[in-house]
């Protein structure tokens, strides 16, 4: 089974490939020219479906829908003391500060927001919605990772807000954990695991 991801983000591609070793996984730019997808949804699920449907439509235009399934991920971090922000805007949280938001600028803004609340830490959780589009229709799953954010960056293994997030039951940030541990506890892995159950069923008729 071949799966095209609705992303060319090397970190996400690496994580998904590590989880789905039994499938042929391709980044978006390996199959088609990357194109802009406007994430206009109001939830992780809506945005994940917007992305995966846009990619699957391109597959149909390329007459590849019988060869590929499309998979997308929309994820982010929700911080309690900030009312759930940055949430679905996690990847572009600092777009009011810089023209092109980066992981670094997003983390800097989150730390600044914590300091404005006069706190160094807050309960938080990651959410990931995994969406699949294929001949059989659309399917979605969710994964969560609960813990807390801190106002400093620690570690060098990860991306996004990993360096300032500590999962429940751990004393190290996600950025300080090894890959195997991350794969076991991450929100994305949990969502991918649930999606793997759906993929196994679909694989029988694909």
Curated annotation (Swiss-Prot):
InterPro entries: dITP/XTP_pyrophosphatase, ITPase-like_fam, RdgB/HAM1. The active site is at residue 74. Its cofactor is Mg(2+). Its EC number is 3.6.1.66. It is an enzyme of class 3 (hydrolase). Substrate binds at residues 7-12, 75, 159-162, 182, 187-188. GO terms for molecular function: dITP diphosphatase activity; ITP diphosphatase activity; metal ion binding; nucleotide binding; ribonucleoside triphosphate phosphatase activity; XTP diphosphatase activity. The keyword Hydrolase applies. Mg(2+) binds at residue 74. Binds 1 Mg(2+) ion per subunit. One of its GO terms (biological process) is purine nucleoside triphosphate catabolic process. It catalyses: XTP + H2O = XMP + diphosphate + H(+); dITP + H2O = dIMP + diphosphate + H(+); ITP + H2O = IMP + diphosphate + H(+). CDD domains: HAM1. It holds the Pfam family Ham1p_like. HAMAP family: Non_canon_purine_NTPase. Belongs to the HAM1 NTPase family. This is dITP/XTP pyrophosphatase. It comes from Campylobacter hominis (strain ATCC BAA-381 / DSM 21671 / CCUG 45161 / LMG 19568 / NCTC 13146 / CH001A).
